UniProtKB/Swiss-Prot annotation:
Residue numbers spanned by region Pseudokinase domain: 263-544
Stated name of the protein: PAN2-PAN3 deadenylation complex subunit PAN3
Lineage start: Eukaryota, Fungi, Dikarya, Basidiomycota, Agaricomycotina
The species this protein was found in: Cryptococcus neoformans var. neoformans serotype D (strain JEC21 / ATCC MYA-565) (Filobasidiella neoformans)
Function recorded in the entry: Regulatory subunit of the poly(A)-nuclease (PAN) deadenylation complex, one of two cytoplasmic mRNA deadenylases involved in mRNA turnover. PAN specifically shortens poly(A) tails of RNA and the activity is stimulated by poly(A)-binding protein PAB1. PAN deadenylation is followed by rapid degradation of the shortened mRNA tails by the CCR4-NOT complex. Deadenylated mRNAs are then degraded by two alternative mechanisms, namely exosome-mediated 3'-5' exonucleolytic degradation, or deadenylation-dependent mRNA decaping and subsequent 5'-3' exonucleolytic degradation by XRN1.
Main location: cytoplasm
Gene name linked to the record: PAN3
Length: 684
């Protein structure tokens, strides 16, 4: 009678050598009578249902088809444990009776051909579902989630039908799928014995060659094609400059950045206070000419406000940004409620309105002055200076003798005029919706901050200067619409004067402009009917189709800017290249290492550095040519096949290599340095 085992699970291990005494004792312990090796059942048959090496010289016993594999020939009876019934096998699998599996059969060895170097290990069969389809040819990784309850058959040992139904032929043909660790097989045996499956104890992943390789990083030295809306435009040529930011946009951005710090030397202009609250470095705008005779503190009265209102540029100590300070001289505060609307103006952020930051009074200039702080837009001009200001008289004797009045600038085209009208109406819509009014809609107070981009300036000044809490705000909004109509007439008619009637300008507009513009102007300047008021909403409805044209222009310009930005996304490629060269060349810790110093790739990179940065002219003076450096580094980054001759410092040897080969040298040397590097090394 066999002694009771310590555990219900039996560890599947490599069968010991027959010459070992330990193997003999173990065989006597588990079997009452010794059997021949030829009568020992192959463990592949007991576990998988068949043996793929049966016709290849397997020395163990393989029962015929239809016979019970648990009953080999000339074997003595061994106690078997009853096994519950297994699920129905898949189609194509020969049906077998309810087999049983003994402990002795689990200890049977596995036949492995001599050509396989790996140790014989059993693969882990998966538990099938009763209605599982035929396993696909492509093996899938086992799921790590919990198995359904109906998929787990609580039994002491799995049946042969279960093991054979889930066996994938492809998995058995590959030795990597057969070979599992002994620990993994032991864990699976324990799980099957106790009726518990560990969903996380799955087989190793399949061969990595069966999957797609990981995605390689992009080659940032290759320039992508422009956007479809830009590339298909015949007005956008594909010349070499199209790969970089356009010259016009670069000049405009650089000019605005220079204008922010123009004339700023850390101090205010002469005659101005060094500090004004939290603002310093006050510079008058526009910058006075060098030949100006009057000091910057003297200014003429404003035609809009009636008081001198000079403008300064200053820097804030709070955030370091630059702001525009409008000073109204001789201001007398009558009512403290005059600043009540400033909170609403500060909260208003609109693309067509110059933002107001704060407003306060001061005596720093020697008088009572009102200071209005706005956002600063460098290199801005006004619609008055752009279209309405008279041109300087031509220096000709004929014009002087004729005493001809100066001619104003030409009127804007209707397409641009509609763009201005749309933006002004957009700003008025936001202001009137907030319960405010502009009250100073004049051409001199409308900034042109970019190409056809306008912003209303000086908002909120009249709310403080002419504070009137008795007049309803709707009356001021009606004045805004009337001023809007007069502004459009002044931009379209050369001869318009505010004192003249509107009949002549309207006749001129009807002949030279569209009827939509004439109807819009007529609505703005006409008096509403009795009991009705004009509204900016009606203005927006009248110009509805024109708004779509403005929307098209805005989106097209956004595509242009996005395309320009795409050309500068990887503008740090040269810096990364220089960084790698700096890491590689002349490392102090490798000075005594003959394998690193002046040999192989490092020597080529050393000569290339001398060629790029240490060139000397005929006169022996160093050549400081930035264009030469950029051209060489860009060719190196692109890996061109162009060849360059590198000469040693003693002029005794030279190498002719291509930029592609130099780039490969950089990558090889940098990878070697990275693999041998120590992140905890302290620089000497």
């Amino acid at each position: 009678m066999l002694p009771p085992p310590k555990s219900a699970a039996v560890q599947i291990v490599r069968p010991p050598s027959p010459s070992s005494e330990k193997a003999k004792e173990k065989e006597k312990k588990h079997s009452p009578e010794k059997r021949e090796t030829a009568q020992r059942i192959c463990r592949n048959v007991m576990i998988y249902g068949y043996c793929k090496y049966q016709d290849q010289g397997c020395i163990y016993y393989h029962p015929p088809a239809g016979a019970d594999p648990s009953t080999p020939q000339n074997s003595s009876p061994v106690a078997h444990a009853p096994t519950p019934s297994a699920p129905t096998p898949l189609a194509g699998t020969p049906a077998r009776e309810k087999p049983t599996l003994s402990i002795e059969h689990l200890a049977a060895p596995v036949f492995v051909p001599k050509g396989l170097d790996s140790s014989p290990r059993a693969s882990t069969p998966s538990v099938p579902t009763p209605s599982a389809p035929t396993p696909p040819v492509w093996p899938s990784l086992p799921s790590t989630g919990l198995l359904p309850r109906q998929d787990v058959q609580v039994s002491a040992q799995p049946s042969h039908a279960q093991l054979s139904a889930t066996a994938s032929p492809m998995a058995y043909d590959d030795p990597s799928h057969i070979a599992l660790s002994a620990a993994h097989a032991h864990a699976q045996a324990q799980a099957l014995t106790h009726g518990i499956l560990d969903p996380h104890a799955h087989a190793p992943p399949v061969d990595q060659s069966m999957y797609l390789p990981p995605r390689q990083p992009l080659d940032y030295n290759l320039y992508a094609a422009p956007l479809p809306s830009i590339g298909g435009n015949p007005l956008y040529p594909t010349h070499p400059h199209a790969f970089f930011v356009s010259d016009d946009l670069r000049r405009a951005i650089q000019a605005k950045q220079e204008a922010v710090y123009a004339g700023a030397n850390g101090a205010s202009a002469p005659g101005l206070p060094q500090e004004l609250g939290v603002y310093h470095s006050l510079i008058p705008l526009p910058l006075p000419a060098p030949t100006a005779q009057c000091p910057p503190t003297q200014s003429q009265p404003s035609k809009v406000y009636g008081l001198p209102s000079p403008v300064y540029r200053a820097t804030s100590e709070v955030d370091g940004n630059t702001y525009c300070l409008r000073r109204v001289e001789g201001f007398k505060l009558v009512n403290q409620l005059a600043f009540a609307s400033m909170d609403t103006w500060r909260r208003m952020r609109h693309p067509n309105i110059v933002g107001l930051k704060e407003a306060f009074t001061t005596k720093t200039f020697g008088d009572n002055s009102l200071i209005m702080v706005y956002d600063y837009h460098p290199l801005s001009t006004t619609l008055y200076d752009e279209y309405l200001s008279p041109n300087p008289p031509e220096p000709s004797p004929a014009s002087a003798l004729a005493n001809q009045p100066p001619k104003r600038r030409s009127s804007p085209p209707e397409r641009i005029l509609w763009s201005y009208v749309t933006q002004i109406a957009n700003a008025l819509k936001a202001i009137h919706s907030s319960g405010l009014a502009v009250r100073n809609l004049d051409a001199s107070k409308i900034l042109l901050t970019g190409k056809n981009r306008i912003r209303l300036n000086g908002c909120g000044v009249w709310d403080v200067l002419a504070f009137d809490n008795k007049t309803p705000v709707q009356a001021f909004q009606q004045e805004d619409l009337l001023s809007f109509g007069k502004l459009i007439i002044s931009l379209t008619c050369d001869f318009f004067q505010p004192t003249l009637p509107f009949s002549l300008p309207l006749e001129h507009i009807s002949r030279h402009y569209s009827s939509d513009l004439s109807n819009l102007i007529l609505y703005l300047i006409s008096k509403p009917a009795q009991g009705q008021i004009k509204s900016i909403d009606e203005v927006v409805k009248m110009m509805g189709p024109r708004i779509l044209n403005e929307l098209d222009a805005v989106q097209s310009y956004a595509d242009v800017l996005e395309n320009e930005l795409g050309a500068e996304v990887e503008n740090g490629r040269i810096v990364r290249l220089l960084t790698k060269l700096g890491f590689i060349n002349e490392r102090a810790e490798f000075e005594l290492d003959p394998r690193w110093s002046d040999t192989g790739d490092r020597y080529i990179l050393k000569l290339f550095r001398d060629y790029v940065f240490h060139s000397v002219g005929v006169d022996g003076k160093p050549i400081l040519d930035l264009s030469h450096v950029l051209v060489c580094l860009n060719k190196l980054d692109a890996g061109l096949d162009e060849r360059v001759m590198l000469v040693s410092r003693d002029d005794q040897s030279c190498l002719v290599v291509s930029y592609r080969e130099i780039k490969h040298c950089i990558e090889a040397a940098f990878n070697e340095l990275k693999n041998a590097g120590n992140n905890h090394r302290v620089h000497r």
